[in-house]
Amino acid sequence: METTGQQLLSPREIDTKIHRLAYEILERHPKQAFVLVGIHRRGVPLAQRLAKVLEEERPGVQTGMLDITLYRDDPDQATFSPDFGHTRLPNDLKGALVILVDDVLYTGRTIRAAIDALFEYGRPSKIELAVLVDRGGRELPIQPDYCGLRQPLGRESYLRVRLREQDGHDGLFLVDNKHDAS
């Protein structure tokens, strides 16, 4: 699928950001085990790519995926997909360090929903957040622990993240309207 709009990150730059996120996680947790949990949709391939980089330094990184559709407080933003309901997490999360992974952090509502969903599977000892892009505009007091790019944008601006696993290519684009951002 072709994407129009101003390109903010190239495929190579996205790969560099993912590697940097992985190394920041390793620096903060050199010996502590953690679980990377990708938020459905584009958080899942990001978590898998982070795990692949982390595996080079620390084999056995656990990953999971989390569908938050039923936990959202903005149902008009929820999109049902063929993967709806597909949450896969390793074992019980009780006492685990969980690192949530998503592509873009905006209002914080997705992350709030993800935290609510996680607690259905056990009470983690700690939850951290890794995002490819923080675009600002928070409505809830949520901040990333690991961030590839901070790109402050107004409400009238939209980002489109493309990942090769889902879209055939990597890229981050500033697009004109909300429909181009999905």
Predicted stretch roles:
Residues M1-S182:
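PRPP-associated nucleotide enzymes
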